[in-house]
Design a protein with these regions (language model features):
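Membrane-embedded alpha-helical segments and adjacent helix-loop junctions characteristic
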Residues: 50-137, 292-367
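Alpha-helical transmembrane segments of multi-pass membrane proteins, especially transporters
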Residues: 29-32, 36, 68, 98-105, ...
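Re-entrant/interfacial helical elements at transmembrane boundaries that shape
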Residues: 83, 116-127, 140-141, 154-170, ...
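Membrane-core helix-loop-helix motifs of multi-pass transport proteins
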Residues: 128-224, 368, 372, 399-434
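Hydrophobic transmembrane alpha-helices of multi-pass small-molecule transporters
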Residues: 1-76, 82, 180-317, 412, ...
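Transmembrane alpha-helix interface/packing and boundary motifs in multi-pass membrane proteins
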Residues: 16-23, 104-113, 144-156, 336-350, ...
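Residues that define the loop-to-transmembrane-helix transition and helix capping
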Residues: 26, 59, 95-96, 137, ...
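C-terminal transmembrane helix pair
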Residues: 177-187, 298, 329-442
Length: 442
């Protein structure tokens, strides 16, 4: 029991430090991981260095790294800005222009990191705002919250989706259709439809005509082909049978990550040869979110450390006792607790921590006989992903959008964000909450 409290204390201190010293989150997570390893070597925990290395989900890290590299090439090709402009010239007024731009950001975000999506689409939103002489603040906020929503739609849309997919043994297609039922993708899309109505109401007074033209020229179509190829190969990888040979099994477990990294390397090498320069490789390396990769590496070890110490089981018991073996009450608690918590804390460490807790709770349900955990997994992902839209600091995409606005001399007040974030989040969460329970909970 004392070792469990020690592990819990280290974990809570780690979390508090990551919240207060966000710039140093990777260092804090790695330091905490090292503490668990040292305590394991000292015999305090049954936790060896090999256990720590085995706890790291290398498939997730490879997927994140490869996807980020592809996104850099995709942005450089100017294809996202070109597509956005093509959409804008076909709408009747500013209300629809902003809404369509937000929806477009959502579609892109289903396959591209949320922050990268904001960086892609924000310049188009700024240009439209300048032409029409309207404030870009609500436009970029709408883009940010929409990209956060759709990040949960597919396995490659966001880090939290990658974490869920890998932890639950889901493949790319399982997000669309799994075990004879519609997957979480359709719940996210229902949430998108509900939030579309919210956006149209919010921007109902923006009735000015749009006088825009397609000015962007695509410089390279190969990155777009690589993005499409990534999705296609992930689908193919979903159908590959699991091998029995241990070596092949290890490669099989990394298949999604290897697809993303492999196509990224093809794009980099091809661009370096085409330009007779290594600049593309250096730019991709510079744009790689090394902080997130190091943060996750450390967190995987920390979470395994607290699992070995019994903290995960104790947390599962606590949730189970609160819900009283009522699956619907537990599902509701997970969804809305995740919404509230993710409004103030980063959803990546939250989801990474809660996945094993949710699995443990599901095993205790039904009088100890256990229940399939998927309804609780999907509730966790929905609440954690959308909860970030409640506040300006709840998601990295929001912070990125606000940073762009400030660089352009705009002031973003809390009420400006809440005016869009709250109705958007509530409408999307409720739609997804009802859908997931009707499809997976009954």
């Amino acid at each position: 029991m004392q070792t469990m409290y020690l592990a819990l204390g280290i974990f809570l201190l780690t979390y508090v430090l990551m919240l207060t010293l966000q710039k140093y989150r990777p260092t804090i997570a790695l330091s905490s991981a090292l503490i668990f390893i040292v305590l394991g070597l000292c015999g305090v925990f049954d936790f060896r260095p090999l256990d720590a290395l085995a706890a790291v989900d290398y498939n997730v890290l490879l997927m994140i790294a490869g996807t980020m590299g592809l996104v850099t090439l995709f942005i450089d090709s100017r294809m996202p800005a070109y597509l956005a402009e093509q959409l804008i010239v076909r709408v009747p007024n500013v209300k629809w222009a902003v809404t369509v731009l937000a929806l477009f950001a959502g579609v892109i975000s289903a396959f591209v990191d949320n922050v990268a999506t904001v960086l892609m689409v924000a310049p188009v939103g700024l240009a439209i705002s300048r032409k029409l002489k309207i404030s870009p603040v609500p436009v970029l906020i709408a883009i940010a919250v929409s990209s956060n929503l759709q990040g949960a739609a597919t396995m490659v849309g966001d880090t939290t989706s990658m974490l869920l997919g890998s932890y639950a043994g889901m493949n790319f297609l399982d997000f669309f259709w799994m075990q004879g039922r519609p997957g979480i993708f359709w719940g996210v899309e229902l949430g998108a439809l509900a939030s579309l109505v919210a956006l149209l109401v919010i921007f109902r007074k923006y009735t000015e005509k749009v006088a825009a033209a397609v000015e962007t020229q695509v410089s390279d179509y190969v990155p777009s082909a690589l993005m499409i190829g990534t999705v296609a190969l992930l689908i193919v990888a979903s159908f590959l049978p699991e091998p029995s040979d241990p070596t092949l099994k290890a490669i099989y477990d990394l298949r999604s990550g290897l697809v993303c990294v492999g196509l990224c390397l093809i794009g980099i090498v091809r661009d370096c040869i085409r330009k007779h320069s290594g600049g593309t490789f250096l730019r991709v390396l510079k744009d790689l979110d090394k902080d997130t990769l190091l943060l996750l590496f450390g967190l995987f070890i920390v979470i395994e450390g607290i699992r070995v110490a019994g903290v995960i089981d104790a947390a599962a018991d606590l949730f189970y006792n609160i819900s009283g073996d009522d699956p619907f009450l537990l599902y509701t608690l997970i969804v809305f607790a995740s919404v509230v918590l993710s409004a103030f804390i980063d959803n990546i460490p939250y989801v990474a921590t809660m996945l094993p807790v949710v699995e443990g709770i599901a095993a205790l349900m039904n009088g100890g006989a256990g229940l399939p955990p998927y309804v609780f997994y999907f509730g966790l992902l929905t609440g954690a992903t959308l909860g970030g839209n409640l506040t300006p600091i709840g998601a990295s995409a929001n912070i990125a959008a606000i940073g762009i606005l400030r660089k352009n001399g705009e002031t973003v007040r809390l009420r400006d964000f809440l005016r869009i974030g709250v109705p958007f989040t509530l409408s999307a969460v409720l739609a997804g909450y009802i859908y997931i329970w009707l499809v997976w909970g009954i």
